């Protein structure tokens, strides 16, 4: 938001930090000219980003009203699933630009996808678009500590996270629902399972996801399919070289690599969980909603060193 040429920050709402400087909470913003946190809302803004905890966005919108012209982008999971997308007169669109760019460009209310969901959907959608998901899909994905949010917990403490590795919510992660719905949107007859194993890594930012499933064509056919599917996607790139996290951290990119072993296709998908998996994608969606250049404010270089 700070460096987006078409945006002017009107307010940052917080009841717990009202009156405090933003840099008091977000120390990386020290020295920036910013308003203080406020408990007062301006109901006439052009766009509102909701960054509340899961389950709180719906309550917030039920208790606050905004101008008919206000566009709302919600970063929680409150409106991501089809059964949850209507609240009163508001109907939310699922905001994966590589899947729903046309619908996003016409929407006023948007549900920003989850971070794991973004990485995994981008890995699978090209296959689904041609009806080529014919078997179960196995996914193993590792996320950094920032995937757990800012609240302190045992598994985000440095002494626990450092030199450590673990899985959590095996086969039951909350992002499975939106992943399955997105895949079924482009391949309606798909009725197999996604076996998703999420892992906690000992790094701060990024998601490294690998998925494999049956694929009878050769590797070149797979590359041509993926390159064609993402030909016009400004942030999703198919690499013929192996990819790694440092290529995407601090960017809105998703990098994809393919590998074939016997009758299995391995798809590697890497993103920054805080940008393409959250706030960066929210800005990308806002650009689409307002008819702006999709890359505006998002041409960022990776933190490689």
Name each model-derived stretch.
Residues 1-162, 166-170, 189, 257-261, ...:
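N-terminal Rossmann-like NAD(P) cofactor-binding subdomain of oxidoreductases
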Residues 209-305:
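C-terminal active-site/capping subdomain that shapes the small-molecule cofactor and substrate pocket
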Residues 172-238:
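C-terminal substrate-binding/catalytic lobe of Rossmann-fold NAD(P)-dependent dehydrogenases
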Residues 107-110, 165, 206-210, 266:
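Short, solvent-exposed beta-strand edge segments and adjacent coil->beta transition regions
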């Amino acid at each position: 938001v700070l460096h987006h040429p078409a945006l002017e920050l009107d307010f940052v709402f917080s009841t717990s930090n009202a009156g405090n400087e933003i840099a008091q909470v977000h120390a990386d913003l020290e020295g920036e000219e910013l308003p203080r946190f406020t408990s007062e809302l301006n109901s006439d803004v052009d766009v509102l980003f909701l960054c509340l905890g899961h389950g709180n966005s719906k309550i917030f919108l039920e208790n606050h009203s905004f101008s008919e012209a206000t566009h709302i982008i919600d970063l929680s999971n409150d409106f991501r699933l089809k059964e949850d997308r209507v609240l009163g007169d508001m109907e939310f669109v699922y905001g994966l630009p590589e899947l729903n760019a046309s619908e996003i460009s016409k929407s006023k209310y948007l549900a920003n996808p989850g971070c794991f969901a973004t990485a995994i959907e981008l890995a699978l959608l090209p296959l689904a678009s041609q009806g080529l998901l014919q078997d179960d899909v196995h996914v193993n994905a590792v996320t950094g500590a920032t995937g757990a949010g800012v609240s302190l917990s045992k598994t985000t403490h440095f002494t626990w996270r450092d030199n450590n590795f673990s899985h959590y919510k095996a086969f039951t992660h909350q992002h499975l629902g939106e992943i399955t719905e997105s895949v079924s949107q482009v391949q309606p007859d798909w009725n197999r399972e996604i076996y998703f194993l999420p892992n906690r890594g000992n790094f701060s930012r990024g998601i490294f996801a690998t998925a494999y499933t049956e694929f009878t064509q050769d590797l070149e056919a797979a590359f041509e399919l993926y390159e064609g599917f993402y030909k016009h996607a400004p942030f999703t790139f198919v690499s013929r070289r192996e990819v790694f996290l440092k290529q995407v951290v601090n960017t809105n990119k998703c990098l994809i690599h393919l590998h074939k072993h016997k009758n299995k296709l391995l798809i590697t998908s890497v993103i920054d969980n805080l940008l393409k998996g959250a706030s960066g994608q929210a800005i990308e969606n806002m650009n689409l909603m307002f008819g702006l250049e999709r890359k505006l404010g998002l041409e960022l270089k990776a933190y490689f060193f």
